[in-house]
Regions:
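Short, highly charged C-terminal tails/helix-capping segments
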Residues: 68-69, 170-187
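Hydrophobic ligand-binding cavity/cleft-lining segments
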Residues: 2, 6-74
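Beta-strand/loop substructures that line and gate deep hydrophobic ligand-binding cavities in soluble
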Residues: 3, 108-163, 169-171, 181
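Beta-strand elements of well-folded, non-transmembrane domains
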Residues: 37, 88-90, 100, 111-115, ...
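Extracytoplasmic/periplasmic/luminal assembly and interaction segments
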Residues: 51-100, 147-149
Length: 187
């Protein structure tokens, strides 16, 4: 009986320690990556704001090209949405919430499975002497306690994926000779 009591006290102490550590960890995260692309923003922006273009460069889509994608609304406009269902990439959606043409995009990303999560997907396009500085940021809140523990690893798990996405976007943008269709094109 005494051994069970000791094991119970140790287990309770570990749970308490876990909860205390989680309580002092950050309640939000922010991952930001930047790349210089040697082309004007007018060539890059449509590849990001028009959600049907994401599968051409998105690193998450590369992980599961057979995932089912659905696009709703006029591409490149506020309210346009991309939803996906896959065994590897899970189930989620992205909705465009704010745009400043060739300068800024803010979207809401919602993961339903495997782990529910809501985040802001932010894009900045800044003109430079040789092209455009593109900054991709994802930020959101972390639930207590497990989300905060997971947040410790978010940068190391996701940072390289963002870098790959920006490298794909850079390659695709610099290979184009004509800007992709924008939401205002009727072609």
């Amino acid at each position: 009986m005494r051994i069970l009591k000791i094991i119970g006290m140790i287990a309770g102490g570990l749970v308490a320690l876990f909860l205390i550590v989680a309580a002092v960890l950050p309640s939000s995260y922010r991952i930001t990556r930047t790349v210089e692309i040697e082309t004007p923003a007018e060539m890059i922006y449509p590849l990001v704001v028009n959600l049907p273009n994401w599968p051409k460069w998105d690193p998450f889509t590369e992980q599961e090209p057979t995932a089912k994608s659905t696009f709703v609304g006029e591409p490149g406009t506020i309210g346009s949405e991309w939803s996906w269902v896959g065994e590897v990439i899970g189930t989620g959606s992205m909705t465009v919430e704010e745009v400043v043409p060739n300068r800024y995009i803010r979207s809401r990303m919602e993961m339903i499975a495997p782990q529910p999560m809501v985040a802001q997907d932010l894009w900045d396009f800044t003109p430079t002497a040789s092209g455009t500085k593109v900054t991709w940021t994802v930020q959101g809140d972390l639930d207590y306690p497990m989300g905060r523990i997971f947040g410790l690893f978010m940068e190391s798990l996701m940072g390289s994926t963002f870098e790959k996405g920006l490298a794909n976007l850079k390659r695709l943008s610099e290979q184009q000779t004509v800007a992709p269709l924008s939401s205002n094109d009727s072609r």
